[in-house]
Design a protein with these regions (language model features):
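Metallocofactor- and cofactor-centric catalytic cores in central/energy metabolism, strongly enriched
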Residues: 2-234, 238-245, 249-250, 257-315
Length: 315
């Protein structure tokens, strides 16, 4: 480790799960956002236990990652935040085929994301689980859930659509993999909705405070940078072990708000926690540049959203 341990073996005070609610508020305040965002918070949490063994269940994969769009600019590892690549409608894909999904459209930790899609889209691991008989079957489709700051839109539009598609596929349980801070809220709201309608769920994520503040039935927390909820990058063993935590939680959780923490540590230095979404680390010049960039990104995202909603209204 790159820090001196306490005499009693304590970790540094900052080596704890990042408080993303506080960080995002401070970050966007520094960027000039004038409205204080309220994250979803519930007192009660729905809970649907499995009614049959997991080895007999059909399991769906839900993601906030976006299909790669070659005409929308850089979207791979190292790409800047790309609002043009956002999506605002639920989409589905055939789980029998491979898919090129990216996460440049969301506010992940760009310094610690790689080209290893297994960290945010564990479709290969779920295929292996199905082949091994760990789950009864992988649902024929995975579903992409839009990341939307409007909780009302998520609850009134996207969640019912996801539920309808899961029911069409005969789904018994769903695994939801979150990426950015708002993705964690979206995944949590979707999990709650599915659970209230009889589908067992587990969220895999890295923003512990956002998920637990919203309140979900089951949560696998990996203390990794955002965008790595399903595995450590380029660590094949971590893909199946992290998924197994989610599968075991589906089987054995007996009450809502059950969180299991991934015992794996991030492979790199833990100091990433001090820098992520921390405006104090930016020079005045860099902060000014980020403010201008944020204004441009918001305009692009709004244009994409407006166009999507207009298309939906005409359909």
């Amino acid at each position: 480790m790159s820090f001196a341990p306490d005499a009693l073996g304590f970790a540094p005070e900052w080596d704890a799960p990042v408080r993303y609610i506080d960080r995002t508020h401070a970050w966007y305040d520094a960027l000039g956002t004038d409205n204080h965002y309220r994250y979803a918070q519930y007192a009660d949490v729905p809970f649907t236990p499995l009614v049959q063994p997991l080895s007999a269940c059909r399991v769906a994969l839900l993601t906030t990652a976006a299909p790669y769009q070659p005409d929308k600019g850089p979207q791979g590892a190292g790409a800047p935040y790309n609002a043009a690549a956002k999506f605002y409608k639920v989409y589905s894909g055939d789980t029998a085929h491979d898919h090129d999904l990216r996460v440049s459209h969301v506010g992940i930790d760009r310094d610690h994301i790689t080209d290893d899609a297994d960290t945010w889209f564990p479709l290969p691991a779920l295929r292996r689980a199905a082949a091994a008989g760990r789950i009864g079957a992988l649902a024929p489709r995975f579903h992409g859930v839009p990341t939307n700051r409007s909780q009302r839109h998520t609850l009134e539009n996207d969640c019912p659509e996801v539920l309808a598609r899961c029911r069409e596929d005969g789904v018994d349980a769903a695994i939801l993999v979150a990426n950015c801070p708002v993705c964690h809220q979206t995944s949590s709201l979707t999990a709650r909705y599915l659970e209230a309608h009889g589908i067992a769920t587990v969220v895999m994520g890295c923003a512990k405070d956002i998920v637990e503040t919203c309140g979900v039935p089951r949560f696998v927390f990996s203390d990794f940078p955002l965008g790595n909820a399903a595995a450590r990058p380029h660590d094949p063993a971590s893909r199946d072990t992290t998924l197994e935590l989610a599968l075991a939680l589906l089987e054995h959780a007996f009450a809502p708000r059950t969180t299991v923490q991934n015992p794996l540590r991030w492979a790199g230095p833990p100091e990433w926690k001090q820098g992520v979404l921390n405006p104090a680390r930016l020079s005045p010049e860099e902060l000014a540049r980020r403010r201008a960039e944020n204004a441009r990104i918001k305009a692009v995202a709004q244009a994409v959203r407006d166009a999507t909603l207009a298309d939906s209204a005409r359909a």
